[in-house]
Regions:
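A short, polar/acidic, helix/strand-boundary loop motif
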Residues: 15, 67-68
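A short, polar/charged loop-to-alpha-helix boundary motif
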Residues: 69-79
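Immediate flanking context of iron-sulfur cluster ligation sites
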Residues: 91-103
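Short hydrophobic alpha-helical segments used for membrane anchoring or interfacial signaling
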Residues: 43-48
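A structural microfeature
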Residues: 60-61
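Short loop/turn microsegments at loop-to-beta-strand junctions
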Residues: 16-17, 38-40
Length: 181
């Protein structure tokens, strides 16, 4: 955990539904941060039924990184939320759902999103080191797969990016202090 650091400031009133749901993903990321985990958060929002009927968008699942806490390489925010959403809906197909995540999904998470048949993915910050929704490769829109997801990126980019930057700066500072001790 980064001690003594201010939490990123976020606009008090989101202007769009995407911003409102991304704010909830940021809240999830802060839970990871409080555990000393990489601050990545995710929510899954159902927007329509399997029959295609539009419904009032509702959060059906939340997740945040817990890899270190659980000693589990699969405990990413997206995987946790996808598992919960499948349980809520009683089906592995998450058609009619949008995934909101503070950092661009890695290859594993992008693959799970495709397998779950999600309609859309909304990303806060892109991930130049492991991003699989356009930064390094784009598994979410790979035409050879049987499913592609629409991507919206950059929703509340600044607070999402700042949270990651401050987290890793804190890790580097702690390592430097340890070496100098």
């Amino acid at each position: 955990m980064i001690s003594g650091k201010k939490q990123p400031k976020i606009a008090a009133k989101p202007r769009t539904p995407d911003e409102r749901f991304m704010l909830e993903a940021i809240r999830q990321a802060k839970k990871a941060l409080a555990l000393g985990e990489t601050p990545i958060g995710c929510v899954i929002v159902q927007t329509r039924t399997y029959d295609g009927e539009e419904i009032e968008p509702r959060i059906i699942a939340r997740g945040y990184n817990r890899r270190n806490t659980e000693k589990n390489p699969l405990a990413h925010a997206e995987i946790t939320a996808i598992r919960k959403a499948a349980k809520v809906l009683g089906d592995w197909r998450l058609e009619g759902c949008t995934l909101y995540v503070t950092l661009e999904p890695c290859p594993m998470c992008a693959g799970a999103i495709v397998q779950a048949r999600m309609d859309r993915v909304v990303i806060g910050a892109m991930n130049a080191k492991a991003g699989s929704a356009g930064s390094i490769l784009n598994l979410l829109q790979e035409p050879r797969f049987n499913h592609q997801a629409e991507i919206t990126e950059g929703v509340l980019r600044e607070p999402c990016s700042r949270m990651m930057s401050e987290f890793f700066a804190g890790i580097r500072r702690a390592r430097k202090e340890k070496r100098e001790a």
